[in-house]
């Protein structure tokens, strides 16, 4: 039997507060190989992320990936690290702080599925503050088992250890949420007004293995639906935007088209002015700031591109905070 964690002895009225948890993927504590290795290990041993039997995957993971990749990843993190810390952690913390300011009757916190602040630590803190109800918002508009599913798993793992369990609601997806779409539209239009506009807009989402989609993961379909709604809001014709998937890992077939492949192909097709936005990322991170903003620019120019603009994520954009407040209010329902 699992041991239950000791909990504060609080009366019902003392456990009647409502909390909102913004849950993102995670980040190492520092841009060093020593910090990256345990982060990668926790991420890549999650059965939601790598759906291979342990006997096959673990020798590869421990023999190759965790030996070679930490140093390479640490170098990439060094390029984008803020003075305050990891961009993903910094921006997610700002989102939580902005939400807390708008909803002062609630306890609002953020946590990471992998790394710090951990779900275990934050839920313990919330329990100590008298939270008996918890709304979990995984910061992924489009549902994928390897992101949203893994985030909810972490919360459920902690519920298994609670003697007096919290009431929990989760937001599984919001890929077609009007506030989310409008926030992106306004953000992109403001960027174009200030920095100019390319001939084509690339909407790059994080990729998933094709097998995941074949087995029922709705993620690629939800990404394409988000892109369609955003393109319509921006009044783009079909030839003015393209949907792609980035961050492939390993040798398995992933959903296509590949963002990296398109960086090489588009200039040869006459597209030499490109803007790139990542709708599935609500906060800038390694995959957007290094892979797209830096490496993507280099790949596009090497292929013959002439103009490349990376449009930052929503981060703590006021329109996105408005949408986040509305999303929380809708899902809190009678808890408010």
Curated annotation (Swiss-Prot):
UniProt EC number: 4.98.1.1
GO biological process: heme biosynthetic process
Pathway note: Porphyrin-containing compound metabolism; protoheme biosynthesis; protoheme from protoporphyrin-IX: step 1/1
Keywords: Cytoplasm, Heme biosynthesis, Iron, Lyase, Metal-binding, Porphyrin biosynthesis
Record InterPro entries: Ferrochelatase (IPR001015), Ferrochelatase_AS (IPR019772), Ferrochelatase_C (IPR033644), Ferrochelatase_N (IPR033659)
NCBIfam families (alphabetical): hemH
The protein, known as: Ferrochelatase
Catalytic activity: heme b + 2 H(+) = protoporphyrin IX + Fe(2+)
Primary gene name: hemH
GO cellular component: cytoplasm
């Amino acid at each position: 039997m699992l041991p239950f964690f000791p909990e504060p002895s609080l009366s019902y009225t003392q456990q009647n507060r409502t909390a909102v948890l913004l849950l993102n993927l995670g980040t190492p504590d520092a841009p060093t190989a020593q910090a990256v290795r345990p982060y990668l290990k926790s991420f890549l041993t999650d059965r939601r992320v790598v759906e291979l039997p342990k006997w096959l995957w673990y020798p590869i993971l421990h023999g190759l990936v965790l030996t070679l990749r930490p140093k390479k990843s640490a170098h990439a993190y060094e390029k984008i690290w803020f003075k305050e810390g990891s961009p993903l952690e910094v921006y997610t913390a700002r989102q939580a702080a902005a939400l807390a300011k708008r909803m002062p009757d609630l306890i609002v916190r953020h946590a990471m599925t992998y790394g710090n602040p951990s779900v275990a630590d934050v839920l313990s803190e919330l329990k100590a503050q008298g939270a008996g109800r918890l709304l979990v918002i995984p910061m992924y508009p489009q549902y994928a088992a390897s992101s949203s599913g893994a985030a909810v798993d972490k919360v459920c793992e902690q519920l298994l250890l609670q003697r007096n369990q919290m009431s929990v609601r989760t937001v599984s997806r919001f890929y077609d949420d009007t506030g989310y779409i409008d926030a992106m539209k306004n953000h992109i239009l403001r960027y174009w007004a200030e920095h100019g506009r390319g001939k084509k807009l690339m909407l790059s989402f994080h990729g998933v293995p094709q097998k995941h989609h074949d087995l029922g993961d709705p993620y690629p379909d939800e990404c394409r639906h988000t892109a369609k709604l955003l393109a319509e809001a921006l009044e783009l014709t079909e030839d003015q935007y393209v949907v792609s998937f980035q961050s492939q890992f390993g040798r398995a077939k992933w959903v296509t088209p590949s963002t990296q492949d398109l960086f090489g192909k588009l200039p040869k097709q006459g597209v030499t002015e490109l803007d790139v936005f990542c709708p599935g990322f609500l906060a800038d991170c390694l995959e957007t700031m290094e892979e797209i903003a830096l490496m993507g620019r280099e790949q596009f120019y090497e292929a013959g591109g002439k103009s490349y603009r990376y449009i930052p994520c929503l981060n703590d954009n006021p329109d996105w905070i408005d949408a986040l407040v509305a999303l929380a209010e809708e899902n809190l329902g009678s808890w408010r």
